[in-house]
UniProtKB/Swiss-Prot annotation:
The keyword ATP-binding applies. GO terms for molecular function: ATP binding; ATP hydrolysis activity; nucleic acid binding; RNA helicase activity. The Q motif is unique to and characteristic of the DEAD box family of RNA helicases and controls ATP binding and hydrolysis. Belongs to the DEAD box helicase family. DDX46/PRP5 subfamily. This is Pre-mRNA-processing ATP-dependent RNA helicase PRP5. Residues 45-126, 153-173, 686-705 are annotated as: Disordered. Residues 73-84 have a biased composition (Basic residues). Gene3D superfamilies: P-loop containing nucleotide triphosphate hydrolases. It catalyses: ATP + H2O = ADP + phosphate + H(+). SUPFAM superfamilies: P-loop containing nucleoside triphosphate hydrolases (SSF52540).
Length: 812
């Protein structure tokens, strides 16, 4: 580098330095002018403030004098003469005690200022702006008087325990961090979005469920019976899909099916899953009311994962989320996150748990990369939505919102936060609420937020309507039962003369219906009989007369146990006790319609053990306690005997309504014949044993038990591959499995592959022959399930034999 180049570089540096110095001089000049202007404003403010403080000092002086008079005896040894409350002192002793004041303001009286001669110097010398300090002190004062209100708004980003403890902070601690609280309060407002102006909003495809063919063939009666067997599912809302009973009916991917069957080992669906999953997958807003631990988490995670897969993935500039799960507590959020990760594994779907008390920086870093599912408490989600002026997260992609334990969300005071969150999400979102109860706050929220929701209630009440009072009477002989009925009806007619209190008497057969009608007519009581043996016109005529007659009495069979709606019916008498739970539920349901109250009275003979078992299961505790002691003890004995017989396999509970057409009649005839053989000591002829009961077609199974920690599971493996096709269908159809599950509590699962006759697996890698697994907590439950299943297998074998005969397979 020559001398000329060095000189040029030096001149450039010098010119640059002069330019920078000139800028600094201008800036310094401006800052000096600004400082002088600020000092002028400060002097004006101090002058005005001094005038205000002088007025306050007068009030304080009066207060301090009164306080000094009250404490004169106490202070007599401390001072020799009365000192003024304020101002200077003439003596040395006064100077020594000048720091003591007679009036000590409370800690929250932060707006009280005593200006001294050196105040102005301190204010000027202090590095902080005195005007800002004064404003902060005013904020402190406001925050002290409204501490609980501030904390109430701030605590939304903590869980319920933190917020409740925060509210108990005393006034002594109030001034701490009041500026921080004020700032936090002011920022927690999610930016509103006008979705009518949002461009390129993704169109949602929420209906992802197709009803299987086997469910489509079910009648309304079958669906009603299935819901009753699934812990008495109650539906409120229009066009609710039918409940499923198998995972395979949901159309899940092979990865999810493998996860459910092999890793999670979910053999069957819980009642809430049976009904809620198809409803949510259909794109409907759902309110699920079920007790905790009933499988609700899987009920909303499966549809959520499926909907996310059906949507376009997040773009590189999108942070998400697509699904939002709100919970009232951190612990529940963490628990849901653990389950969500299981379903997201290997699917490319990401999930994050955001709760108060966790590392916010790490959550922000993950959110910037984009997430599909956020599991959060309401407060922490609002924190994230308001960060970076609302640019960290965008709610425009949120299409699926879940509120788990929604009742607790509102009980813990998260209602305003939830409303704020829901208000910023797109209006065509799908919303799912799960709750153990359905309080009024939640009802109001659901009516405002959800669109045409389906409400699914699982076993929230008894099987019997709360408006119905159940009663029971036990008899030894039939004529005593009739005399009791006669007296009850006579007393009732006399008591309600001039009123309209109708009665329905249910009997077990058409013959008894006609007989009871004649006997009551002979005793001066007019009734209207209806049963399937009467012409249709006569049945309609008698039903119309019953409705038009005050205090009318209707005698009928099970033909009217469902569908009859006469609000004036206040008494139902079950003359022949119900043999099934479904029959009993629908029979007593003829009274207590709507908001009316009713009474259901069951007549039970001492040998009707199954009926006693049903009554004990259906009657409420207060109803059982109101039964006369003699009747209650006998009812309990009968129930205990039947329960013991269920465990040993001696007794079994009839399923459904008991009516199975001609097949059912054949079973009754066979049972009657066997009973006669037993009564007369006659041995059945071996030639009477049918082919289907021989060893060649007998249901084959192996039994065992499995130890799992402190519990034992009993199981049986049933070979159904070699059964006739009709028998195999009869044993494995949905209705059979659900009924047996209801009666025994056992779980069912089919495994293996079907092999035609004469064929089977060739090596160990091939699937075994088709078999059915039955598992239960008690050995007696498995025994009972095997017996019920064997009955169904025999039924199928009998149908197969009849079909072969009709087809001409066997001819002379």
């Amino acid at each position: 580098m020559d001398q000329t180049e060095k000189l040029r570089i030096r001149q450039e540096k010098l010119a640059k330095w002069k330019k920078q110095k000139l800028n600094n001089d201008v800036t310094a000049s401006v800052s000096v002018d600004a400082k002088e202007e600020r000092l002028k404003k400060l002097e004006a403010w101090k002058k005005k403030k001094k005038q205000q403080d002088e007025l306050k000092q007068k009030d304080i002086k009066l207060t301090s004098i009164k306080s000094a008079d009250r404490d004169r005896n106490k202070r007599r040894g401390q001072c020799s003469r009365k000192r003024p409350a304020f101002g200077g002192s003439d003596s040395e002793s006064d100077d020594e005690n000048s720091t003591s004041t007679l009036f000590k303001p409370r800690r929250n009286d932060t707006n009280t200022h005593v200006l001294t001669k050196d105040n102005s110097k301190d204010d000027l010398d202090d590095g902080n702006d005195a005007l800002d300090e004064y404003i902060h002190k005013l904020i402190d004062k406001d925050s002290n008087t409204n501490r609980v209100r501030l904390i109430d708004n701030i605590s939304e980003d903590e869980d319920a325990n933190d917020s409740s403890s925060e509210k108990t902070i005393s006034q002594e601690e109030a001034p701490v961090d009041s500026e921080i609280l004020f700032k936090k309060k002011g920022r927690k407002k999610i930016k509103a979005i006008d979705y009518s102006k949002v461009l390129n909003l993704i169109t949602l495809n929420k209906c992802l469920y197709r009803e299987p063919n086997d469910l489509g063939l079910m009648s309304e009666k079958d669906v009603e019976e299935l819901r009753l067997s699934l812990d008495n599912i109650k539906i409120s809302g229009k066009d609710c899909p039918k409940p499923v009973t198998k995972w395979s009916q949901l159309g899940l991917s092979s990865e999810i099916m493998d996860l459910i069957s092999n890793e999670l080992q979910f053999v069957t669906l819980t009642p809430i899953q049976c009904q809620a999953i198809p409803a949510i997958m259909s794109g409907r807003d759902v309110i699920g009311i079920s007790k905790t631990g009933s499988g609700k988490t899987v009920a909303f995670l499966l549809p959520l994962v499926r909907q996310i897969k059906a949507q376009p993935p997040l773009a590189p500039d999108e942070t998400g989320p697509i699904g939002l799960i709100l919970t009232p507590t951190r612990e529940l959020a963490v628990q849901i996150q653990e389950e969500a990760l299981k379903f997201c594994k290997g699917s490319g779907i990401s999930s994050i748990c955001c709760v108060g008390g966790s590392e916010l920086k790490q959550q922000i870093n993950e959110l910037k990369r984009g997430v599909d599912i956020i599991v959060a408490t309401p407060g922490r989600f609002i924190d994230l939505m308001t960060l970076n002026s609302g640019h960290l997260l965008s709610p425009t992609r949120i299409s699926f919102v879940v509120m788990d334990e929604a009742d607790r969300l509102f009980d813990l005071g998260f209602g305003p936060q939830v409303n704020q969150i829901m208000g910023c999400i797109r209006p065509d979102k799908q919303c799912v609420l799960f709750s153990a109860t359905f309080p009024s706050k939640l009802k109001h929220f659901a009516s405002r937020t959800l669109k045409n929701p389906i409400q699914i209630t699982i076993n929230s009440k008894s099987l019997i309507n709360e408006n119905i009072q159940q009663r029971v009477q036990i008899f030894d002989e039939e004529h005593v039962k009739f005399e009791f009925l006669l007296k009850r009806l006579s007393d009732r007619l006399a008591l309600h003369r001039g009123e309209d209190e109708k009665t329905i008497i249910f009997v077990g057969s058409q013959q008894l219906c006609d007989l009871l009608y004649d006997e009551l007519l002979l005793n001066g009581i007019t009734t209207f009989p209806i049963h399937a043996g009467k012409p249709s016109a006569e049945r309609l005529r008698n039903l119309q007369k019953f409705k038009e007659t005050d205090n009318g009495i209707l005698i009928c069979t099970e033909v009217l146990s469902r569908g009859l709606n006469v609000p004036e019916v206040s008494l139902v008498i079950i003359y022949n006790a119900a043999k099934t739970i479904a029959q009993y539920v629908h029979t007593v349901g003829r009274t207590g319609r709507g908001t009316n109250n009713g009474v259901a009275l069951s007549f039970v003979m001492v040998d009707e053990l199954a009926s006693a078992y049903i009554l004990v299961k259906c009657m409420k505790e207060n109803e059982l306690s109101s039964v006369p002691m003699v009747v209650y003890q006998k009812l309990k004995e009968m129930n205990d005997e039947f329960s013991s017989g269920l465990k040993t396999g001696k007794y079994r509970l009839i399923q459904g309504f008991g009516g199975k057409g001609l097949d059912h009649l054949d079973e009754l005839n066979e049972a009657k014949q066997s009973q006669e053989y037993t009564d007369y000591g006659v041995v059945e002829n071996e030639e009477d044993v049918t082919e289907e009961e021989s060893g060649a077609t007998k249901m084959e199974y192996t039994r065992g038990k499995r130890e799992e920690g402190h519990s034992t599971t009993y199981f049986a493996h049933i070979n159904i591959n070699d059964l006739p096709q009709l028998a195999r269908w009869e044993a494995t159809k949905t209705e059979t499995v659900s009924n047996i599950k209801q009666e025994t509590g056992c779980n069912f699962e089919s495994k293996g592959s079907f092999y035609p006759e004469g064929k089977g697996p060739k090596n160990d890698t091939d699937d075994p022959k088709l078999y059915l697994i039955v598992e239960g907590a008690e050995e007696s439950d498995v025994t009972m399930a095997l017996e019920l299943l064997n009955t169904k297998v025999k039924e199928g074998i009998r149908k197969a034999a009849v079909k072969d005969i009709q087809s001409g397979k066997y001819r002379m």
